[in-house]
UniProtKB/Swiss-Prot annotation:
This is Protein GrpE. The keyword RNA-binding does not apply. Keywords: Chaperone, Cytoplasm, Stress response. GO terms for biological process: protein folding. The lineage of its organism: Archaea, Methanobacteriati, Methanobacteriota, Stenosarchaea group, Halobacteria. One of its GO terms (molecular function) is adenyl-nucleotide exchange factor activity. Residues 1-28, 136-152, 204-217 have a biased composition (Acidic residues). Disulfide bonds: none annotated. Gene3D superfamilies: 3.90.20.20, Head domain of nucleotide exchange factor GrpE (2.30.22.10). The keyword Nucleotide-binding does not apply.
Length: 217
Protein backbone atom coordinates (compact mmCIF):
# COMPACT_ATOMS: atom_id res chain seq x y z
CA UNK A 1 0.00 0.00 0.00
CA UNK A 2 1.35 3.39 -0.91
CA UNK A 3 1.86 6.19 1.56
CA UNK A 4 -1.01 8.18 0.02
CA UNK A 5 -3.43 5.32 0.43
CA UNK A 6 -2.33 4.85 4.05
CA UNK A 7 -2.95 8.52 4.83
CA UNK A 8 -6.42 8.34 3.29
CA UNK A 9 -7.39 5.33 5.37
CA UNK A 10 -6.13 7.02 8.56
CA UNK A 11 -8.05 10.21 7.79
CA UNK A 12 -11.22 8.22 7.18
CA UNK A 13 -10.83 6.43 10.50
CA UNK A 14 -10.39 9.72 12.36
CA UNK A 15 -13.49 11.16 10.67
CA UNK A 16 -15.52 8.13 11.71
CA UNK A 17 -14.28 8.48 15.28
CA UNK A 18 -15.17 12.19 15.40
CA UNK A 19 -18.62 11.48 13.99
CA UNK A 20 -19.23 8.88 16.66
CA UNK A 21 -18.39 11.41 19.40
CA UNK A 22 -20.04 14.49 17.77
CA UNK A 23 -21.96 16.85 20.14
CA UNK A 24 -24.94 16.63 17.84
CA UNK A 25 -25.57 13.25 19.38
CA UNK A 26 -26.77 14.87 22.60
CA UNK A 27 -28.95 17.61 21.09
CA UNK A 28 -32.11 15.55 21.47
CA UNK A 29 -31.53 14.72 25.13
CA UNK A 30 -33.94 15.95 27.83
CA UNK A 31 -32.49 19.15 29.40
CA UNK A 32 -33.64 18.06 32.83
CA UNK A 33 -31.93 14.73 32.36
CA UNK A 34 -28.80 16.52 31.21
CA UNK A 35 -28.78 18.70 34.33
CA UNK A 36 -29.44 15.67 36.49
CA UNK A 37 -26.53 13.92 34.86
CA UNK A 38 -24.30 16.94 35.45
CA UNK A 39 -25.45 17.15 39.05
CA UNK A 40 -24.59 13.52 39.53
CA UNK A 41 -21.21 13.82 37.84
CA UNK A 42 -20.25 17.27 39.16
CA UNK A 43 -22.58 18.26 42.03
CA UNK A 44 -20.32 21.01 43.34
CA UNK A 45 -20.33 22.84 40.01
CA UNK A 46 -24.11 22.63 39.62
CA UNK A 47 -24.64 23.77 43.22
CA UNK A 48 -22.39 26.76 42.62
CA UNK A 49 -24.34 27.67 39.49
CA UNK A 50 -27.63 27.45 41.41
CA UNK A 51 -26.29 29.74 44.13
CA UNK A 52 -25.13 32.22 41.50
CA UNK A 53 -28.52 32.11 39.75
CA UNK A 54 -30.36 32.65 43.04
CA UNK A 55 -28.14 35.63 43.86
CA UNK A 56 -28.70 37.09 40.40
CA UNK A 57 -32.46 36.59 40.75
CA UNK A 58 -32.41 38.29 44.16
CA UNK A 59 -30.47 41.23 42.73
CA UNK A 60 -32.95 41.55 39.87
CA UNK A 61 -35.88 41.47 42.31
CA UNK A 62 -34.23 44.16 44.43
CA UNK A 63 -33.63 46.28 41.34
CA UNK A 64 -37.24 45.76 40.25
CA UNK A 65 -38.56 46.76 43.68
CA UNK A 66 -36.34 49.84 43.68
CA UNK A 67 -37.58 50.88 40.23
CA UNK A 68 -41.20 50.35 41.27
CA UNK A 69 -40.65 52.42 44.41
CA UNK A 70 -39.01 55.21 42.45
CA UNK A 71 -41.82 55.14 39.89
CA UNK A 72 -44.46 55.40 42.63
CA UNK A 73 -42.61 58.35 44.21
CA UNK A 74 -42.40 60.11 40.86
CA UNK A 75 -46.09 59.50 40.23
CA UNK A 76 -46.97 60.86 43.69
CA UNK A 77 -44.75 63.89 43.16
CA UNK A 78 -46.39 64.56 39.81
CA UNK A 79 -49.88 64.28 41.29
CA UNK A 80 -48.92 66.66 44.11
CA UNK A 81 -47.45 69.04 41.55
CA UNK A 82 -50.70 68.98 39.56
CA UNK A 83 -52.71 69.65 42.73
CA UNK A 84 -50.46 72.56 43.69
CA UNK A 85 -50.74 74.03 40.21
CA UNK A 86 -54.52 73.68 40.25
CA UNK A 87 -54.75 75.32 43.68
CA UNK A 88 -52.53 78.14 42.47
CA UNK A 89 -54.74 78.66 39.41
CA UNK A 90 -57.84 78.63 41.61
CA UNK A 91 -56.29 81.24 43.90
CA UNK A 92 -55.38 83.42 40.94
CA UNK A 93 -58.89 83.12 39.51
CA UNK A 94 -60.39 83.91 42.92
CA UNK A 95 -58.17 86.98 43.33
CA UNK A 96 -59.08 88.22 39.87
CA UNK A 97 -62.78 87.68 40.57
CA UNK A 98 -62.53 89.38 43.96
CA UNK A 99 -60.82 92.41 42.44
CA UNK A 100 -63.54 92.69 39.80
CA UNK A 101 -66.32 92.28 42.36
CA UNK A 102 -64.83 94.97 44.59
CA UNK A 103 -64.90 97.40 41.66
CA UNK A 104 -68.49 96.43 40.90
CA UNK A 105 -69.41 97.11 44.53
CA UNK A 106 -68.11 100.65 44.15
CA UNK A 107 -70.31 101.06 41.08
CA UNK A 108 -73.25 99.68 43.06
CA UNK A 109 -72.66 102.21 45.82
CA UNK A 110 -72.72 105.03 43.27
CA UNK A 111 -75.94 103.73 41.75
CA UNK A 112 -77.50 103.43 45.18
CA UNK A 113 -76.57 107.01 46.01
CA UNK A 114 -78.08 108.14 42.71
CA UNK A 115 -81.35 106.43 43.63
CA UNK A 116 -81.38 108.12 47.03
CA UNK A 117 -81.11 111.59 45.47
CA UNK A 118 -84.63 111.71 43.97
CA UNK A 119 -83.43 111.78 40.37
CA UNK A 120 -85.76 112.48 37.46
CA UNK A 121 -88.19 109.68 36.71
CA UNK A 122 -86.58 108.85 33.35
CA UNK A 123 -83.09 108.72 34.84
CA UNK A 124 -84.28 106.82 37.90
CA UNK A 125 -85.82 104.09 35.78
CA UNK A 126 -82.55 103.53 33.93
CA UNK A 127 -80.53 103.55 37.14
CA UNK A 128 -82.87 101.03 38.75
CA UNK A 129 -82.56 98.73 35.73
CA UNK A 130 -78.77 98.96 35.85
CA UNK A 131 -78.88 98.38 39.62
CA UNK A 132 -80.88 95.18 39.17
CA UNK A 133 -78.55 93.92 36.43
CA UNK A 134 -75.55 94.55 38.64
CA UNK A 135 -77.15 92.67 41.53
CA UNK A 136 -77.84 89.75 39.19
CA UNK A 137 -74.16 89.66 38.22
CA UNK A 138 -73.09 89.72 41.87
CA UNK A 139 -75.57 86.98 42.73
CA UNK A 140 -74.19 84.88 39.89
CA UNK A 141 -70.70 85.19 41.38
CA UNK A 142 -71.99 84.01 44.76
CA UNK A 143 -71.68 87.42 46.40
CA UNK A 144 -73.83 87.78 49.53
CA UNK A 145 -74.68 90.96 51.40
CA UNK A 146 -73.73 91.48 55.05
CA UNK A 147 -76.61 93.46 56.55
CA UNK A 148 -76.77 93.00 60.32
CA UNK A 149 -80.02 94.00 62.01
CA UNK A 150 -80.03 96.36 65.02
CA UNK A 151 -79.28 94.43 68.18
CA UNK A 152 -76.98 91.96 66.39
CA UNK A 153 -73.74 91.11 68.17
CA UNK A 154 -70.85 92.89 66.48
CA UNK A 155 -68.29 90.78 64.64
CA UNK A 156 -64.94 92.50 64.01
CA UNK A 157 -64.35 90.26 60.99
CA UNK A 158 -67.63 91.29 59.34
CA UNK A 159 -68.46 94.68 60.82
CA UNK A 160 -66.57 97.97 60.60
CA UNK A 161 -67.51 100.14 63.57
CA UNK A 162 -67.80 103.81 62.63
CA UNK A 163 -68.65 105.09 66.10
CA UNK A 164 -70.49 104.27 69.30
CA UNK A 165 -73.85 105.88 69.98
CA UNK A 166 -76.51 105.87 72.64
CA UNK A 167 -79.44 103.71 71.64
CA UNK A 168 -82.09 101.42 72.99
CA UNK A 169 -80.18 98.43 71.66
CA UNK A 170 -78.11 96.40 74.13
CA UNK A 171 -74.61 97.69 74.74
CA UNK A 172 -72.04 96.37 72.28
CA UNK A 173 -74.58 95.42 69.62
CA UNK A 174 -75.30 97.00 66.24
CA UNK A 175 -77.27 100.21 66.60
CA UNK A 176 -77.62 101.05 62.90
CA UNK A 177 -76.36 99.81 59.53
CA UNK A 178 -74.78 102.56 57.42
CA UNK A 179 -73.40 100.59 54.48
CA UNK A 180 -73.85 96.89 53.74
CA UNK A 181 -70.85 94.64 53.48
CA UNK A 182 -70.29 91.73 51.12
CA UNK A 183 -68.74 88.29 51.22
CA UNK A 184 -67.99 85.68 48.58
CA UNK A 185 -67.21 82.01 49.13
CA UNK A 186 -66.94 82.62 52.86
CA UNK A 187 -64.43 85.46 52.46
CA UNK A 188 -65.37 88.97 53.51
CA UNK A 189 -64.75 91.35 50.61
CA UNK A 190 -65.98 94.40 52.45
CA UNK A 191 -67.12 94.71 56.05
CA UNK A 192 -70.48 96.27 56.81
CA UNK A 193 -70.22 99.78 58.26
CA UNK A 194 -72.21 100.06 61.48
CA UNK A 195 -72.61 102.14 64.59
CA UNK A 196 -72.44 100.30 67.90
CA UNK A 197 -74.77 100.89 70.79
CA UNK A 198 -73.48 102.18 74.11
CA UNK A 199 -76.84 101.38 75.63
CA UNK A 200 -79.51 103.89 76.58
CA UNK A 201 -78.48 107.25 78.03
CA UNK A 202 -78.72 108.00 81.74
CA UNK A 203 -81.64 110.36 81.12
CA UNK A 204 -83.54 107.63 79.33
CA UNK A 205 -82.97 105.23 82.20
CA UNK A 206 -84.14 107.86 84.70
CA UNK A 207 -87.26 108.48 82.64
CA UNK A 208 -87.94 104.76 82.51
CA UNK A 209 -87.56 104.53 86.29
CA UNK A 210 -89.91 107.48 86.76
CA UNK A 211 -92.47 105.94 84.46
CA UNK A 212 -92.26 102.75 86.45
CA UNK A 213 -92.83 104.57 89.74
CA UNK A 214 -95.81 106.44 88.31
CA UNK A 215 -97.28 103.16 87.20
CA UNK A 216 -96.88 101.72 90.69
CA UNK A 217 -98.86 104.60 92.16
Amino acid sequence: MSDDQGDAVEASSEADEEASTSPDEGDDRDPVAAVAERAENDPASVAAELVALREEAAELETERDDLESRLKRKQAEFQNYKKRQEKQREKERARATEALVEKLLEVRDNLNRALEQDADADIREGVEATFRQLDDILDGEGVEAIEPDPGTETDPKRHEVLLQVESDEPEGTVAELHRPGYEMAGKVLRAAQVTVSEGPSGDSEAEDDADGEDGDE
